[in-house]
Every structure is written in C-alpha cells, then in structure tokens.
C-alpha cells in the first residue's frame, strides 16, 4: 500500500486535483474540507503526510498545524502548506510552526512533485525524474 496523505482544503477543485494526481502516483489520499474535519481524520487514522490550506472555515490551517506538531502521535508527520497567503511573513510563520514545504496557489504539478520528492525518500519514479 502507498503512503497515506491527508489533503485539507476548502476548495473542492483543489482537493480533486490533488486526489487525482496523488492517486496516479500510488498514494492513498483522504480529504477534509476544513480544519475540524482534518483533526477528526487525524485522530482516527495515521497519515504519512499532511497537505494543508491555511484559510479555511471552522479551524484554519495554522491551528491544524499547531495541533499536529504538538501531538506526540503526529508531530513527526511532514506538512506541506498549500495557500494563497504568499507573504514572506506567512511562509516564515509556517516554517516556525514546523512546516516542511510551502506552496503558493496557484501551484503547478511540478511544484507538487518537488514537494513530494522532498518529503519521501521512496518517491515514485515519475517524481524522482
């Protein structure tokens, strides 16, 4: 079974794009439309990577990341931020919270593949190329 990735974004089109492309690469993808759904899934299941938007209803991405990084069960899980917040201060805040890779919207498939390459040593051949 491939690595398990939780994609958290309130935009359906973003989640669908990620689900399709990540599944083609052999990853198992779960989705959440907001931070509360994300935390519920993280309590129930184990994931190898979190891809998280910042600006979401109910619980924003910063709150999700703080909880993930403060929980002994999930603190080592890598996090990719995917957001329209493209100020340097936002990026620095993410890295201060323990984010591993920061992608601005709109993003490209190449940027996504590069982020996966950084997160996993055993990436699919398409990602390593």
Feature map (PLM): residue ranges:
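C-terminal output helix
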Residues: 107-117
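Acidic, metal-coordinating helix/loop segments flanking the phosphotransfer/catalytic sites
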Residues: 6, 31-49
């Amino acid at each position: 079974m491939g690595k398990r990735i939780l994609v958290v974004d309130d935009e359906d089109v973003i989640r669908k794009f990620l689900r399709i492309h990540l599944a083609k690469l052999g990853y198992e993808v779960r989705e959440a439309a907001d931070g509360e759904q994300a935390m519920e899934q993280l309590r129930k299941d184990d994931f190898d990577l979190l891809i998280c938007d910042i600006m979401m209803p109910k619980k924003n991405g910063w709150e999700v990341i703080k909880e993930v990084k403060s929980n002994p069960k999930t603190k080592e899980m890598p996090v990719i931020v995917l957001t329209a917040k493209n100020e340097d201060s936002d990026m620095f805040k993410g890295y201060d919270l323990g984010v591993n890779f920061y992608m601005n919207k709109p993003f490209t498939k190449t940027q996504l593949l590069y982020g996966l390459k950084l997160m996993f040593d055993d990436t699919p051949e398409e990602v390593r190329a």
